[in-house]
């Protein structure tokens, strides 16, 4: 007879309070198949129901530390254990201890480490999850979910070296995962590795398909525009911003930076004003965007209107920016408020 049905019979006995009959059936199955995972787990349930806690733990270890038991089965058992633990409103120490015992063994499959990491994150134990997630991506470099969790933890800590460390192998493992290129570009930008940023963005754009979200493509071109500007390659910067806005005409960051850099060069001011106005409409309390718009109006000679927008910028924390404060002084001076200008030029 199929041993699976024997175990189910034992489970029915156990559910109906026939503990001895259940025990006898489980023992019979285990005598024939000592590594039968269903029988081992049911035997653990028997020990739990009969209050034999030590034997219950031993039986769980027999199952979860058994190399002959498949990772799928172990994951299924651990999921059931987690559900039972939550339903009984117990703390997480027992589950964590169980995972730790399993993790002491050499893992050759990512399923258990991934489940453990997800459990730790559900318990707000982010720091503890990081080494477990690192083990997951070592075992399965194509596990993008685990890699994104590692990136998320590094972003929270503003650890850009860690982001680079996590993203570089991610790109090698899954070259079409554009999110890794994006975070890598941001991290290189923070590290002031400008050539690396341009290289990463260019490589990302090689993997664009018909299904790629246009906003994502726009962001890569926008980053390239920012980098070309820092390198004083203005023609390339403006071309990149143009491309960015082709893919997403509402890319606020690209609109603002493009408009501001045009105003600094005192060129295409009508185009700059049009772009900047879109950012102010989208985020009317953003001091950076208000300042850009005010400065474009200033460069066009619309001093009274410029003052309205620079005042708004100052009301929205603009006084924390030296650039905005200096612009404020310049605009006040050109509206005839010399005293106000001197106050801001200090």
Give residue spans per PLM region.
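Leucine-rich solenoid repeat scaffolds
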Residues: 338-345
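Alpha-solenoid helical repeat scaffolds
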Residues: 1-336
């Amino acid at each position: 007879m199929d041993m699976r049905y024997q175990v189910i019979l034992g489970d029915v006995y156990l559910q109906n309070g026939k503990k001895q009959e259940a025990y006898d059936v489980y023992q019979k199955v285990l005598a024939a198949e000592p590594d039968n995972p269903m029988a081992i787990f049911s035997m653990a349930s028997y020990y739990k129901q009969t209050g034999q806690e030590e034997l219950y733990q031993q039986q769980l270890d027999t199952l979860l530390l058994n190399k002959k038991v498949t990772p799928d089965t172990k994951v299924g058992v651990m999921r059931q254990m987690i559900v039972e633990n939550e339903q009984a409103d117990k703390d997480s120490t027992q589950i964590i201890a169980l995972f730790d015992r399993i993790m002491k063994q050499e893992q050759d499959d990512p399923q258990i480490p991934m489940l453990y990491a997800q459990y730790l994150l559900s318990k707000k134990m982010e720091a503890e999850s990081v080494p477990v997630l690192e083990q997951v991506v070592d075992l399965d470099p194509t596990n993008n979910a685990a890699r994104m969790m590692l990136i998320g933890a590094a972003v929270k800590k503003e650890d850009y070296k860690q982001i680079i460390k996590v993203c570089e192998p991610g790109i090698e493992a899954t070259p079409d995962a554009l999110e890794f290129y994006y975070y890598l570009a941001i991290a290189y930008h923070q590290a002031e590795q400008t050539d690396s940023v341009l290289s990463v963005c260019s490589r990302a754009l090689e993997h664009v398909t018909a299904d790629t979200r246009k906003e994502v493509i726009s962001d890569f071109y926008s980053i390239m525009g920012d980098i070309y500007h820092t390198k004083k390659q203005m023609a390339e910067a403006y071309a990149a911003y143009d491309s960015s806005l082709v893919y997403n005409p509402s890319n606020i960051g690209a609109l603002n930076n493009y408009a501001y850099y045009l105003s600094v060069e005192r060129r295409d001011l009508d185009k700059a004003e049009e772009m900047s106005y879109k950012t102010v409409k989208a985020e009317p309390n953003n001091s950076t965007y208000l300042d850009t718009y005010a400065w474009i109006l200033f460069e066009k000679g619309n001093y009274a209107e410029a003052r309205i927008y620079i005042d708004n910028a100052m009301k929205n924390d603009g006084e924390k920016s030296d650039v905005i404060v200096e612009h404020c002084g310049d605009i006040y001076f050109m509206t005839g408020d010399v005293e106000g200008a001197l106050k801001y030029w200090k």
